[in-house]
């Protein structure tokens, strides 16, 4: 069976979608699974053994461009896919499998996709509270799984593999000392500072970890580089020697390998959190207005700290310097205690 998956467009969602690929491969061992997704996803997809080919999606996240989608679909006809799974809920994401004449097209109904999907499922959000459960449910025939409790357990969580040789080579390429173990920070998050633990808390945690004999590495995109510099600026010159701001300095492939080399990760609710979880790194995940009830880190080595419940829209007055009060209230000492507990369990 040849399968085409139209994959998500965000790092975290792409990582969670691996649970679907793993489940499909477990159910259909001979299946060949190709995933169409933005080109930046290739470093993630290339480390998923279930995925045969990563097909770059040349269209932007918001672009309809129906003519180009028709052309893309027609170009895929020669591959003769038997089935398609469409993971985004948008109307446009279902067009390419339709134009590719793939006979069986599965996905949640989403934006009125009658006809485009001929196996459209109606989502009961209460029955499927976790995004990963919604992905995995699509691997089963319609009506077989009526709620998350019906899914075979344990779920096949995302897993990325990185070799020891890759880690040592990448650390050398970035001139990271082998004298001290690495702790990674992921201080960025999409949609601005409201989902971020304050930089001054990260700085205080970095000081304590450096004084304990660790070195700290900051990961993220170019948008997070300034936040990384704010963390660095709060350290004295001796401490700065053991803290590297690599936000915006690495490609995604390099960041994956370096995160794998870390003894532990401290992270906001972000895509890199899901990467760290898939790499089986001990991690402390810090949540504020966004909720771990929908997209938690999928790892037995993850500790979630959140001081509020439910989902909160951010309003003016809720934040200081853009930070949400519930994240301001998470103390560096609390995070350090969780880190120490995780590291002791790992024998570090």
Swiss-Prot record:
Zinc keyword on record: no
Keyword Glycosyltransferase applies: yes
InterPro entries: Glyco_trans_9 (IPR002201), LPS_LOS_Heptosyltrfase (IPR051199), RfaF (IPR011910)
Domain of life: Bacteria
GO molecular function ontology, one term from the record: ADP-heptose-lipopolysaccharide heptosyltransferase activity
Enzyme class: transferase
Catalytic activity: an L-alpha-D-Hep-(1->5)-[alpha-Kdo-(2->4)]-alpha-Kdo-(2->6)-lipid A + ADP-L-glycero-beta-D-manno-heptose = an L-alpha-D-Hep-(1->3)-L-alpha-D-Hep-(1->5)-[alpha-Kdo-(2->4)]-alpha-Kdo-(2->6)-lipid A + ADP + H(+)
GO term, biological process aspect, one: lipopolysaccharide core region biosynthetic process
Keywords: Glycosyltransferase, Lipopolysaccharide biosynthesis, Transferase
Enzyme Commission number, as recorded: 2.4.99.24
Pathway(s) it belongs to: Bacterial outer membrane biogenesis; LPS core biosynthesis
GO CC aspect terms: cytosol
Role summary: Glycosyltransferase involved in the biosynthesis of the core oligosaccharide region of lipopolysaccharide (LPS). Catalyzes the addition of the second heptose unit to the heptosyl-Kdo2-lipid A module.
Protein family: Belongs to the glycosyltransferase 9 family.
Protein name, UniProt field: Lipopolysaccharide heptosyltransferase 2
